[in-house]
Amino acid sequence: ADRFRKEMPGIQITVEVMNDRPALETSKDSPLVKQIMKTAQMVGISTEDKGHYFYTDASQIIPEISVPFVIAGPGDDALAHCINEHISLESVRRYAKLYQKYLEKYYL
């Protein structure tokens, strides 16, 4: 806004925050994170523990129930929410296998 005020004297700018949700984090030392990463490696998915700068419904749900969570799914971050966003069927299959193996190993 300051740059525009310098370039266009007299301009009026109003900023309204439409959605201000707190960031969420699950420690990389969390059993859930370790289990998901181990299972991903078992099914041939390369893993990286990292944060993301985007909105997820988890920001409304997780604070209410206080459970650890991870975002793990198919797709390329660089293609998310762009005109030609797409996911390969092979990527969907790999992650379906991850979910299946994770449930079998830790819950069945």
Task: Please annotate each region the language model reported.
Residues 1-108:
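Metal-dependent amide/peptide-bond hydrolase catalytic core
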